[in-house]
Curated annotation (Swiss-Prot):
Organism: Citrus limon (Lemon)
Protein name: Phenylalanine ammonia-lyase
Record field: catalytic activity: L-phenylalanine = (E)-cinnamate + NH4(+)
Keyword Lyase assigned: yes
Membrane-spanning ranges: none
A Pfam match: Lyase_aromatic
PANTHER family (UniProt xref): HISTIDINE AMMONIA-LYASE
SUPFAM superfamilies: L-aspartase-like (SSF48557)
């Protein structure tokens, strides 16, 4: 997006009262608070949708002030096919600042990094401006890559591409004193998928990301130690990189200030932060949807999403989280079935659901607000000018300041990481309830799906893995920015550690993806187990009813027998008893089903009075025949029901198809190709988790997730008066 107003430098700026799409300072809002607040208008979900839309556009047009998180992430993914175009309107402003530097050199103007040394040794002076820039790049090439046999010390190429894009965007604003041709060359590298190799560590993101950015400059100047990676993963030297990018002008001889312009910025930290926040925002929405599915499979009570509760708390993140969950649960077949169960048997489960379900909006809401605020902070940062000095052509001066201080990156990434850890903690609590038969309202222990629970331990290993993920995530929640060390002869005595914090947040996002993938597979397992439960319960009810009619209705001489009145109470037992508590051996003498069915018959016999003394009217004497007939019939019917379900011919269809959460279930089961996990199958849980994790990393879960919410109008349901 290009802006219509001009600065005194001849480039776009908001100083004269214009308005940037991302809210840069304007004449009517000199402190930028109003536009910062305005940027948070609307729902978080709508913002994420816009982010995804920007990610999917085929071209990123750089003008200096309108770069977005989604665009950075698109370019970071080298296989996305998205191309970068530079706004031609920026050329004049870039040239003006470059010309000013050369003119000032000719006039003998003393400028930091142009005629002086660097940092704590800026008292030194030189007239060899080009040689000074060459030395700057040489001494900053201080990173370590290692041999790669055990571990990689190279910055991920996606982060490097993000940094290249952000740095070009910054330099386009025309305050940096660099030739436009250098920016065009970096853009050609991006468009030809040629990525310089940058060290993973070695920056404190103040004065900018000096060390890693110097390796981009090293490639541009043809330093022999510089390397790049091509589109097919091949390692390239500078000559090969230039040839593949179609740059025929040869390596650059840096002019005064150009080396400093390339390295004195926060682009590596902010570029990685942008890609991290793209993922974090999507994972935040995913956590809301998964919490709603968790409520469905746990037979949760949906009143925890009622708008009045959240309206009275006032926090927008909480209100939106509750509204999203409310939307998914509204009309859910699981919710309807659970409500019926709660009405007929109110004592079967606690009056209130546990905190991991009932307070999930209150827990997730603040995390969403933190992630959203961090997103806005980073979006401002990737559109900021971070050099020192800044070239102000309009006032004919170089401004010496500290925009290279990447504190917005360090702070926003620390905050984001804490939010991610909190989301992971909730997810682990929900997962722990889901696999525990003491809490999960009738699902089998460990979500075992097989016939023999003694040889099927379901998600037990997964719960251990989830505990490990969660523990590491909680450790990563510790801040990075409170570990600042004074650097560079105490000139850089406070520094942001922006890239370090971004790297740790990228790790946290990756771990939350592991947790989300595992949890999603577990939820799909629970959905299928509820389907199995419903079909098995229906089979048991029909079989008990059939046996009761056959054995208890008539006496030996064909007369009506007093035991015929037992059937209704026998069916109540089946309705109230958790199927998975007995279904592996339903007719065992110690089975809770058989014990309670027998107790019904005993109770009726005790009420039968004197008729128990007569063998033709005794209910006690019917118990043996009833149990024998049930033992003959029930195991066979249970196996038939299981087999029919496994073959896709279940008597009762899966309720999930009637729910708004179905798109996520569908992609996991049908498109990704997972299925009910049982001990009888060779396939391990980890194999299924891996499939979903890979799909999540490839962005394949985004559309199904949004499909769950496609009918949401962005508002809570009206507060009902009944």
């Amino acid at each position: 997006m290009e802006l219509s107003h001009e600065t005194c430098n001849g480039i776009k700026n908001d100083r004269n009262g214009g308005t940037s799409s991302l809210g840069l300072c304007t004449g009517t809002d000199p402190l930028n608070w109003t536009v910062a607040a305005d940027s948070l208008k609307g729902s978080h979900l709508d913002e994420v949708k816009r982010m995804i839309d920007e990610y999917r556009r085929p071209v990123v047009k750089l003008g200096g002030e309108s770069l977005t998180i989604g665009q950075v992430t698109a370019i970071a993914a080298h296989d996305s096919g998205v191309k970068v175009e530079l706004a031609e309107a920026a050329r004049a402003g870039v040239k003006a600042s470059s010309d000013w530097v050369m003119d000032s050199m000719m006039k003998g103007t003393d400028s930091y990094g142009v005629t002086t040394g660097f940092g704590a040794t800026s008292h030194r002076r030189t007239k060899q401006g080009g040689a000074l820039q060459k030395e700057l790049i040489r001494f900053l090439n201080s990173g370590i890559f290692g041999n790669g046999t055990e571990s990689s010390h190279t910055l991920p190429h996606s982060a490097t591409r993000a940094a290249m894009l952000v740095r070009v965007n910054t330099l386009l604003q025309g305050y940096s004193g660099i030739r436009f041709e250098i920016l065009e060359t970096i853009t050609k590298f991006l468009n030809h998928n040629i990525t310089p190799c940058l060290p993973l560590r070695g920056t404190i993101t103040a004065s900018g990301d000096l060390v890693p950015l110097s390796y981009i400059a090293g490639l541009l100047t043809g330093r022999p130690n510089s390397k790049a990676v091509g589109s097919n993963g091949q390692v390239l030297n500078p000559t090969e990189a230039f040839n593949l990018a179609g740059v025929t002008s040869g390596f650059f001889e840096l002019q005064p200030k150009e080396g400093l312009a390339l390295v004195n910025g926060t682009a590596v930290g902010s570029g990685l932060a942008a890609t991290v926040l793209f993922e974090a925002n999507i994972l935040a929405i995913m956590s809301e949807v998964l919490s709603a599915i968790f409520a469905e499979v746990m037979n949760g009570k949906p009143e925890f999403t009622d708008h009045l509760t959240h309206k009275l708390k006032h926090h927008p993140g909480q209100i939106e989280a509750a509204a999203i969950m409310e939307h998914i649960l509204d009309g859910s077949s699981y919710v309807k079935a659970a409500q019926k169960l709660h009405e007929t048997d109110p004592l079967q489960k606690p009056k209130q659901d546990r905190y991991a379900l009932r307070t999930s909006p209150q827990w997730l809401g603040p995390q969403i607000e933190v992630i959203r605020a961090a997103t806005k902070m980073i979006e401002r940062e990737i559109n900021s000018v971070n050099d020192n000095p800044l070239i102000d052509v309009s006032r004919n001066k170089a401004l010496h300041g500290g925009n290279f201080q990447g504190t917005p990156i360090g702070v926003s990434m620390d905050n984001t990481r804490l939010a991610i850890a909190s989301i992971g903690k909730l997810m682990f609590a929900q997962f722990s309830e889901l696999v525990n038969d003491f809490y999960n309202n009738g699902l089998p222990s460990n979500l075992t799906g097989g016939r023999n629970p003694s040889l099927d331990y379901g998600f037990k290993g997964a719960e251990i893995a989830m505990a490990s993920y969660c523990s590491e995530l909680q450790f990563l929640a510790n801040p990075v920015t409170n570990h600042v060390q004074s650097a560079e002869q105490h000139n850089q005595d406070v520094n942001s550690l922006g890239l370090n914090s971004s790297r740790k947040t990228a790790e946290a996002v990756d771990i939350l993806k592991l947790m989300s993938s595992t949890f999603l597979v577990a939820l799909c397992q629970a959905i299928d187990l509820r389907h199995l439960e419903e079909n098995l319960k229906n089979t048991v009810k029909n079989t008990v009813s059939q046996v009761a009619k056959r054995v208890l209705t008539m006496g030996v001489n064909g007369e009506l027998h007093p035991s015929r009145f037992c059937e209704k109470d026998l069916i109540k037992v089946v309705d109230r008893e958790y199927v998975f508590a007995y279904i592996d051996d339903p007719c065992s003498a110690s089975s809770p089903l058989m014990q309670k069915l027998r107790q019904v018959l005993v109770d009726h016999a005790l009420d039968n009075g004197d008729r128990e003394k007569n063998s033709t009217t005794s209910i006690f004497q019917k118990i043996g025949a009833f149990e024998d007939e049930l033992k003959t019939l029930l195991p066979k019917e249970v196996e038939i029901a299981r087999t029919e379900l496994e073959s896709g011919n279940a008597a009762i269809p899966n309720r999930i198809k009637e729910c708004r959460s179905y798109p996520l279930y569908k992609i996991v089961r049908e498109d990704i190709g997972t299925s009910l996990l049982t001990g009888e199958k060779v396939r391990s849980p980890g194999e299924e988790f891996d499939k979903v994790f890979t799909a999540m990393c490839e962005g394949k879960l985004i559309d199904p997730m949004l499909e769950c919410l496609k009918e949401w109008n962005g508002a809570p349901l009206p507060i009902c008066q009944n």
